[in-house]
């Protein structure tokens, strides 16, 4: 596990070195990934999508696909690297604890390798160094192009009609108690609104909710980004000495 953790630090390092504040990049990149994840839950709800497996896995997959769709390759790699790095940090912190087999989310290192695999699988020729630096085993790497193709076919079957009709029904930012989170999420909202016409409007609130989390609330068509989650990411970036 420590080898994988160290590897992701190296994967992220070239892109992070160009930025003025690597800690801010780590926090922002993870906020982007989580926001896309919650949007996945929203689309599953609004489009009444069939999910053959765990919904959390489907939302994770969409997060990687949207990062690749919205961002240029170098920036997308940084986001995926920082997101995977966060999973590796969580796994390291939980060493010695009994795995939470009851949890709806996959184990942190499973999510780590899935993120790396799906990103690598979109362009194996040009992302081989990324996969190698992230210690993606050859056995898994051999299937990543197929995994990515299946993910694209599955999600884009439903995303493409939304893209064809864009712009249309929009995502909007409502309450925003944290300026940093609001700045990050506002840019994503603007970009997504240009690319997709959603089934119904989604509002996003950034506010304290008493826990480190983010939610999609179906009855309200609302994504809640907890300020505690960003605080947790800042603490994690500080502890990792980014």
Residue ranges and their predicted role:
Residues 205-239:
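Catalytic zinc-binding patch centered on the HExxH motif and its immediate surroundings
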Residues 33-46, 60, 64, 225:
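Active-site recognition of the HExxH zinc-binding catalytic motif
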Residues 98-192:
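Pan-zinc metallopeptidase signature
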Residues 53-70:
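An active-site-proximal "capping" alpha-helix that borders the catalytic cofactor pocket
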Residues 19-33, 48-49, 236-242:
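Short pre-active-site segment immediately N-terminal to the catalytic Zn-binding motif
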Residues 12-14:
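N-terminal signal peptide c-region/cleavage motif recognized by signal peptidases
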Residues 1-7:
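Sec-dependent signal peptide recognition
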Residues 29, 54, 78, 110, ...:
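Extracytoplasmic
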């Amino acid at each position: 596990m420590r080898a994988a953790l160290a590897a992701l630090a190296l994967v992220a390092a070239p892109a992070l070195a160009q930025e003025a504040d690597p800690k801010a990049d780590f926090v922002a990149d993870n906020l982007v990934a989580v926001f896309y994840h919650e949007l996945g839950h929203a689309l599953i709800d609004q489009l009444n999508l069939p999910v053959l497996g765990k919904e959390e896995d489907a939302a994770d997959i969409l997060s990687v696909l949207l990062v690749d769709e919205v961002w240029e390759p170098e920036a997308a790699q940084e986001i995926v690297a920082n997101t995977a790095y966060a999973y590796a940090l969580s796994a390291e912190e939980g060493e010695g604890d009994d795995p939470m087999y009851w949890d709806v989310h996959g184990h942190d290192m499973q999510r780590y390798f899935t993120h790396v695999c799906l990103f690598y699988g979109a362009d194996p020729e040009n992302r081989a160094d990324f996969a190698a630096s992230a210690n993606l085993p050859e056995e898994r790497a051999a299937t990543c192009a197929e995994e990515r193709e299946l993910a694209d076919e599955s999600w884009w079957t439903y995303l493409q009609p939304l893209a064809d009709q864009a712009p249309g029904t929009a995502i909007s930012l409502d309450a925003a108690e944290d300026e940093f989170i609001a700045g990050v999420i506002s840019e994503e909202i603007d970009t997504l609104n240009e690319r997709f016409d959603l089934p119904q409007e989604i509002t996003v609130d950034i506010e304290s909710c008493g826990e480190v989390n983010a939610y999609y609330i179906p009855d309200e068509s609302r994504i809640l980004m907890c300020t505690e989650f960003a605080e947790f990411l800042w603490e994690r970036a500080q502890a990792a000495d980014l």
